[in-house]
């Protein structure tokens, strides 16, 4: 996954992958609300393995920005791009590229609530770190104003954890693993001697999804 930002993503965001791509006939559905390729039967809801499955993200972004999706499947001879102007042939490798320009230009009142470019960039990098921890088998690269900001190659889980966490964490942590009925827990915890005053490097994941939970945070804090 490669992400390119301009002015903290306010001016332009490009997210590209080398996945399976979206067939031409399905591209219009990508921007429709409540349309998704992640769910095909009701039973799929019982074991969701993807980050998104409600079909709302792209439609929501398309309603407040200029969005272009370019995609190509392995079977297709060429890529296709969809935007407000319709669907046209395009150059592109296998996978999907989503370009978002002029965020909130359709809703100026909401645009003024955006923070500075530096702050918005920091928020995006933090989100990428969370996704990277959840999917260590995926390579992530982030470029900010054409300069490399983050590069995490596909790697084993432990190496990904140490790449995202502060440098001192590797020598000041212990692996954690436990089992209970219907539950398997694993992770890494820092030693009390390396405790931080802030909880900005606490990450909790349930079935591969990042969550914020005050009960878990309180349990960890109480243990220390």
Cite the ranges covered by each PLM segment.
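N-terminal phosphate-binding caps/lids of nucleotide- and nucleic-acid-binding domains
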Residues: 1-224
């Amino acid at each position: 996954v490669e992400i390119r930002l301009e002015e903290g993503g306010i001016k332009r965001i490009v997210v590209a992958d080398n996945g399976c791509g979206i067939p031409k006939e399905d591209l219009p559905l990508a921007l429709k609300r409540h349309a998704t390729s992640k769910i095909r039967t009701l039973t799929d809801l019982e074991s969701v393995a993807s980050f998104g499955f409600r079909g709302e993200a792209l439609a929501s972004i398309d309603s407040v920005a200029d969005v272009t999706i370019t995609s190509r499947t392995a079977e297709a001879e060429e890529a296709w791009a969809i935007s407000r102007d319709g669907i046209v042939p395009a150059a592109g490798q296998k996978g999907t590229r989503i370009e978002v320009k002029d965020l909130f230009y359709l809703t100026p009142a909401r645009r003024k609530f955006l923070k500075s470019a530096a702050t918005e960039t920091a928020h995006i990098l933090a989100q990428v770190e969370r996704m990277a921890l959840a999917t260590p088998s995926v390579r992530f690269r982030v470029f900010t104003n054409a300069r490399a900001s983050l590069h995490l190659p596909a790697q084993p889980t432990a190496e990904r954890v140490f790449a995202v966490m502060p440098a001192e964490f590797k020598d000041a942590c212990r692996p954690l693993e436990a089992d209970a009925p219907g539950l398997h827990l694993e992770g890494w915890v820092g030693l009390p001697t390396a405790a931080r005053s802030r909880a900005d490097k606490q990450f909790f994941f349930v079935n591969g999804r990042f969550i914020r939970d005050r009960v878990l945070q309180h349990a960890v804090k109480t243990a220390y």
